[in-house]
From Swiss-Prot:
It comes from Methanopyrus kandleri (strain AV19 / DSM 6324 / JCM 9639 / NBRC 100938). InterPro entries: Deacylase_DtdA_archaea, DtdA. The gene is dtdA. The lineage of its organism: Archaea, Methanobacteriati, Methanobacteriota, Methanomada group, Methanopyri. Signal peptide: none annotated. D-aminoacyl-tRNA deacylase with broad substrate specificity. By recycling D-aminoacyl-tRNA to D-amino acids and free tRNA molecules, this enzyme counteracts the toxicity associated with the formation of D-aminoacyl-tRNA entities in vivo. Belongs to the DtdA deacylase family. The keyword Membrane does not apply. HAMAP family: Deacylase_DtdA (MF_00562). GO terms for biological process: D-amino acid catabolic process. This is D-aminoacyl-tRNA deacylase. It comes from the Archaea. One of its GO terms (molecular function) is D-aminoacyl-tRNA deacylase activity.
Length: 279
C-alpha cells in the first residue's frame, strides 16, 4: 500500500472540511516532526494515511519537496473557486504547461502526475455523489497553478465553488473517501490529454466510461501554442508516468496544432487517439 500524505491548509474552509472528514472516524497512530512539517499517521477502515498542515497557500507550498523524500504521493486538499459558483468536486495535477506562472510554480514546469490515484479518486467522488444524490459536478480539471514540482506524484482534490459548498460536510466526506480510495488504486492505463475546456468534459466522460483509462496531465485548448508546444509536450509526457497514449479532443484545436502533435507523438513512439474512440 502506498504512503500517501495529505496537505491541508487551516485557513482554507474546504481544506479544513476534508481534513476533519478524514479523521472523524479514524484512529491516530503516530506523530512525527520533520524539518518543516508535523506529520500525523492515521488509520480508517483499514487504510493508513498521513496528514500534515501546510505552511501557507497550497499553490505556493514549495517546501513539499521535504515530503516527497518520505512519501510516495502527495495530495493537496483545497477549495475550488470559479466565477459561476458551480458546485463541483474535482481532481487535477498541478503545474504550469505554458510560459506563464501567475499562481505559483514555474513557467513550463508541471508536477509529476498520479494517474491511478486520481482515477480512483474520481470514481469514488462519482460513486459517493450518486449514492447520496448530491448536487455536484464530478470532473477532472486541466493542469494548472503551483506549487513547484515536489519530486513525487501529486494531485489536488477540491470542493467548489463557494463558502456554502466548501463547508458542506457531505462534500468533505466525498473527498475524504476519494483520498482513501487513492491510497491503493487498481492498475490503470495512463494517458495524457490534449484539448477541451478547463473542466475537461470529454476527457472526464472517457475516464468514467472506460475503467482502465486514467489521465495524468490534461492540457486545454487555451494552453496550446505553436511557440512552446514541443517543450510543453515533453514536460507533460515525461511527468505522466508510464503514459503510452495521447488522447485528443480536437474539436477546437487548430489543425496545425493537431498535425504537430501527431509528429511529436510519432517521434516519441507513442499513440494518438481521439477522445471519442476511447469512451
Amino acid at each position: 500500500m502506498r504512503r500517501v500524505v495529505i496537505l491541508w491548509n487551516p485557513d482554507d474552509p474546504a481544506s479544513k472540511n476534508i481534513a476533519e472528514s478524514l479523521t472523524e472516524d479514524a484512529e491516530k497512530l503516530d506523530t512525527e516532526d520533520l524539518q518543516h512539517y508535523t506529520v500525523e499517521t492515521w488509520e480508517r477502515d483499514g487504510v493508513r494515511f498521513h496528514l500534515t498542515a501546510a505552511l501557507g497557500d497550497l499553490i505556493e507550498e514549495d517546501e513539499a519537496r521535504e515530503l516527497a523524500r518520505k512519501f510516495d504521493v502527495i495530495v493537496f486538499a483545497s477549495r475550488h473557486e470559479s466565477r459561476t459558483k458551480k458546485p463541483s468536486l474535482t481532481v487535477h495535477v498541478p503545474g504550469n504547461p505554458t510560459p506563464e506562472a501567475k499562481f505559483g510554480g514555474k513557467p513550463l514546469e508541471v508536477c509529476t502526475a498520479d494517474p491511478a490515484g486520481m482515477k480512483a479518486a474520481l470514481l469514488e467522488l462519482k460513486r459517493f455523489r450518486d449514492k447520496r444524490g448530491l448536487d455536484y459536478d464530478v470532473c477532472y480539471e486541466v493542469t494548472h497553478h503551483g506549487p513547484r514540482d515536489p519530486g513525487a506524484p501529486c494531485f489536488f482534490i477540491e470542493i467548489g465553488s463557494d463558502e456554502e459548498r466548501w463547508t458542506d460536510e457531505e462534500a468533505g466526506e466525498a473527498c475524504a473517501r476519494a483520498i482513501l480510495a487513492a491510497v491503493d488504486p487498481p492498475d490503470v492505463k495512463a494517458v495524457v490529454g490534449y484539448g477541451g475546456g478547463h473542466y475537461a468534459p470529454a476527457h472526464t466522460d472517457a475516464a468514467l466510461s472506460n475503467r482502465k483509462l486514467a489521465y495524468g496531465h490534461i492540457v486545454p485548448d487555451y494552453a496550446v501554442d505553436h511557440d512552446y508546444l514541443r517543450d510543453q509536450f515533453r514536460e507533460v509526457v515525461d511527468k505522466t508516468p508510464r503514459a503510452r497514449e495521447i488522447i485528443v479532443d480536437d474539436r477546437n484545436l487548430d489543425s496545425g496544432i493537431v498535425e504537430r502533435l501527431e509528429d511529436l507523438v510519432r517521434d516519441r513512439g507513442l499513440r494518438l487517439r481521439d477522445v471519442e474512440e476511447v469512451k
